[in-house]
């Protein structure tokens, strides 16, 4: 088995696993926008969740229907479609379904991007609303000096949202143009998936951070401590995005050089 086959297979399993995780996250636990299940209403689950992040960070979208409809719930459909879209056999066996699902997929991407705009307009960023005992840009990272660099963490979030939208545009254009370039379409679709699923990996890194603090400083050291929860949340977003992007580029590197960055 070649390195490229191994890379793509691991990538596919990773994408599928993270997609399932996010579907469960959105609809069941914590399910803040879900009409069928709200795990945060369970006292035991809420205590466990609050040890990692403040309750408001998880629940704040519950009172913002437009954000739920435009951003959160479409993300679950986006995750449901993604594994089918990137499965080689599915693409070959069901080309019409692949084309139709692809149009829906990129429409969902556009909706999610608009949902991020709503989040920004309503100032629902975690560093703005979820840690009232800390200043907006205080303790945004355990080690990155955003303020000394003249930056706010919102710039990181804007960059991530812009890249998500840009990769979707490139992926769609590569397949929809008259001179279709399916290798470029594949590369940009994977970059788009990495841009979106960095959010799922963030959840993993949050847990890893707290586990590391447990091992280094004693059980529960960082649990429920805003001064640690906030930078852990911010750094985990950066790490999740970086790991997803780097692994994606490794996979894309196995495509022919002439098609990796072309859009048509």
Predicted regions span which residues?
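Alpha-helical membrane insertion/targeting regions
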Residues: 1-264
């Amino acid at each position: 088995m070649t390195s490229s086959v191994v890379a793509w297979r691991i990538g596919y399993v990773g994408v599928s696993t993270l997609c399932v995780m996010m579907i469960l996250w959105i609809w069941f636990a914590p399910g803040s926008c879900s009409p069928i299940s709200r795990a945060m209403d369970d006292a035991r689950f809420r205590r466990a969740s609050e040890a990692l992040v403040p309750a408001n960070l998880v629940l704040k979208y519950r009172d913002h229907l437009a954000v739920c409809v435009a951003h959160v719930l479409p993300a679950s459909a986006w995750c449901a479609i993604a594994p089918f879209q990137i499965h080689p056999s599915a693409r070959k066996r069901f080309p019409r379904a692949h084309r139709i699902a692809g149009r829906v997929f990129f429409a969902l991407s556009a909706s999610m991007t608009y949902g991020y705009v709503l989040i920004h307009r309503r100032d629902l960023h975690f560093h703005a609303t979820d840690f009232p005992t800390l200043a907006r840009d205080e303790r945004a990272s355990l080690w990155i000096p955003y303020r000394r660099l003249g930056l706010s963490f919102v710039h990181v979030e804007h960059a991530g949202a812009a890249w998500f939208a840009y990769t979707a545009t490139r992926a769609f254009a590569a397949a929809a143009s008259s001179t279709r370039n399916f290798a470029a379409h594949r590369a940009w679709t994977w970059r788009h998936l990495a841009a979106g699923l960095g959010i799922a990996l963030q959840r993993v890194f949050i847990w890893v951070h707290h586990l590391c603090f447990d091992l280094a400083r004693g059980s529960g050291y960082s649990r429920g401590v805003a001064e640690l929860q906030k930078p852990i949340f911010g750094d985990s977003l950066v790490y999740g995005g970086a790991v997803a992007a780097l692994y994606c580029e490794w996979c894309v590197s196995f495509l022919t050089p002439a098609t990796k960055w072309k859009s048509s």
